[in-house]
A protein has these predicted regions:
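N-terminal beta1-alpha1 ligand-phosphate binding loop
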Residues: 1-27
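Short histidine/acidic/glycine/proline-rich micro-motifs that form metal-
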Residues: 9-13, 40-41, 69, 120
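Short glycine-/acidic-enriched loop or helix-start segments at secondary-structure transitions
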Residues: 15, 74-76, 103-106
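Short, aromatic/basic amphipathic alpha-helical patches
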Residues: 16-25, 48-52, 106-108
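S-adenosyl-L-methionine/SAH cofactor-binding core of RNA-modifying enzymes
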Residues: 28-93
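Rossmann-fold NAD(P)-binding glycine/threonine-rich loop
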Residues: 97
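Structured adenosyl-cofactor binding patch, chiefly the S-adenosyl-L-methionine
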Residues: 105-148
Length: 148
C-alpha cells in the first residue's frame, strides 16, 4: 500500500521535511509514505477539471481531498477505513489544498473528502501532521503498540 501526500508547492522549511521524514522512514514494506511536491497529478486535476470529458484516474488508486468542512474520523476509525481501502486499492492519494483550499471543480474528482479538525491549519504544517496521522493509522493496522 502506497500512501501519497500531494501538495501543489515545493521548497518548504527544513523542519517541515524533518517532520515528514520522521514518520515516512518508519514505514515497512509493503507500506510506503511519499511526499509529492508540486504534484503533477494535482495540477492535472485542476487543468482538466473544466473539460467535458472527465479526468480518468488509474485503476487501484483512491483520491482523498483534505478539506474542511468534511467528514471527521478519530484515529481508530481512520485506521479501519484505510485498512478497508487497502483491500481494494493499491495507492491512496491525499491532497492538501492551497491557502485557499481546493478549487470547487477539483473536489468532484475526490472519491471522498476528510477533515482533520474544525480548526484551520496552514497548508505547509499539514505535511508533518498528515505524516503522523497516516503513520498512526498504519501502526494501528499492523497491530503496533503506537499511542491510540
Amino acid at each position: 500500500m502506497k500512501f501519497n501526500l500531494h501538495i501543489d508547492q515545493a521548497k518548504f522549511p527544513k523542519w517541515i521535511y524533518a517532520g515528514f521524514d520522521n514518520y515516512a522512514d518508519k514505514f515497512r514494506y509493503p507500506y510506503e509514505l511519499v511526499l509529492v511536491e508540486k504534484s503533477l497529478l494535482y495540477k492535472n486535476l485542476i487543468k482538466y477539471s473544466n473539460l467535458a470529458k472527465p479526468f480518468s484516474q488509474p485503476m487501484g488508486h483512491y483520491y482523498i481531498g483534505l478539506d474542511s468542512p468534511s467528514k471527521e474520523l478519530d484515529s481508530e476509525q481512520l485506521s479501519n477505513h484505510l485498512h478497508l481501502l487497502s483491500q481494494e486499492f493499491s495507492e491512496l492519494h491525499f491532497f492538501i489544498g492551497s491557502a485557499y483550499g481546493h478549487p470547487n471543480n477539483v473536489k468532484s474528482y475526490f472519491d471522498e473528502r476528510l477533515s482533520l479538525s474544525s480548526l484551520t491549519f496552514g497548508h505547509q504544517i499539514m505535511i508533518p501532521i498528515m505524516a503522523e496521522v497516516i503513520y498512526r493509522s498504519y501502526t494501528l493496522m499492523i497491530g503496533h503498540p503506537y499511542h491510540k
